[in-house]
Amino acid sequence: EDSASGRLGIRPEDVRRPELLDGAFEGALEELLASPPESEDIEASMENLNLADSGLVDYQVSQTKNCGLWTISNITAPDAGPDAGEQMNGIARKARSLLEASGNGSTDDIIFSTVLLHSMVDFATVNGVYASLFKRPNPPARATIACGNSLGEGVKVMASFVVDLGPRDRRQGLHVQSRSYWAPANIGPYSQAMSIVQGTGRLVYIAGQIPLEPASMELASRSPEEGNSWFENYELRVVLSLQHLWRIGTAMQVDWWLGVIAFLSGEGCMDTKARVAWHIWEKMHTRNDEEMEEDDEPVLDAWDIKYGHRGDEQALKPALPDLPNFAVVQSNASVPPFFAVQVKELPRGSDIEWQGLGCRCARVEITPMEIQHGHQVDTVVDDDFTYTCIEIGIEHSDMVPQGLQRIIDTHCLHTEAHAVVYTRYPLSGSFTHGQIVPCKAIWSQEGRRLAAGIVLQRKKPS
């Protein structure tokens, strides 16, 4: 052949393609497939009430400043017009106005955003307007979901922003824009991760990750000829998208996940999907004997791999994630908080999207406790920053929204803590302490059904 590759006897199919999953995640997938959880949904026993049906959807813009962060939440603009693009333009104007009036920053200081759409049909239109907010490299990390009628009558878009009030030169970003075998390139104007200084460590905001195959940028699925069930395809996607989160976290030197949200879409077998997501999350935070033995094995350096003909030895050894770093955990609890949240739609028609907050730190203390209406987990980072997750059990649905408001007031009224509330029930119009993410259902650890889940970020109480 005339080509250089032909003269060398190399064909495209001879070039090594990395496996889709690393060793640790491949092992986790095999374990899931070997013992699938029982499929037992309980939607029939749930109340039919949701935010749209309640007639009490009245989202108020919320602003909080704490821990060097300024959060601006629940911005809508139905008055700008019926079209999603028009409303995103209205939201952009409101965001710029708030930032300019404060004198505390500009849109260049936004490090994370949550975009809630009425429908994913509007994804491309909203993306075009949203991109106009950010002119510099490393735009904010982002999570985008569709909530349907839960946004309220006439509302096509709602956006919330996290603004870093610290020096710009101390931020770090990861913005992957080209295809590779490592992790998906972004499918919109966002960074995969943004990292900011928090005390003596760093907070790392990771964009929502869906199960795209990095090389093709198509949703992962098993070969149809293999006769795989929806369950096997879903398990592949839930593991792959979590691997994306892990790889980005590792690249950003995350030591520990403060918490994670597994956004789910679809209508059938949702309890099973939530339990599967929990099981893989738990699995990846279980330290086994093999990992402890790995710590004592010598690591091959680059010379050995390239010139010492020991690359195969390195390739055969199971890849173990650098996350989690158990050395920083100063408590018996070892699995970070987890919520699974059912929404109407996710980007690209995905049925799973992982979104997490990581930290680079020297010390983490995790304290679980039972409270009046459910369960609470406090995670204190470097004795400075507190991340709290509160679960309100489905059996306490009758206390929402009044009881939920009391919980928020208790934690936020005098501390300027920032709250994110995931719920299928209406909140009072006076809710002004944080961000609302309306959803169809929510689960916590072990796939327990919840009436609401609350995430709080604040300075550790003195």
Question: PLM features: what roles do these ranges have?
Answer:
Residues 1-462:
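Short, polar/acidic, helix-capping and beta-turn segments at strand->helix junctions
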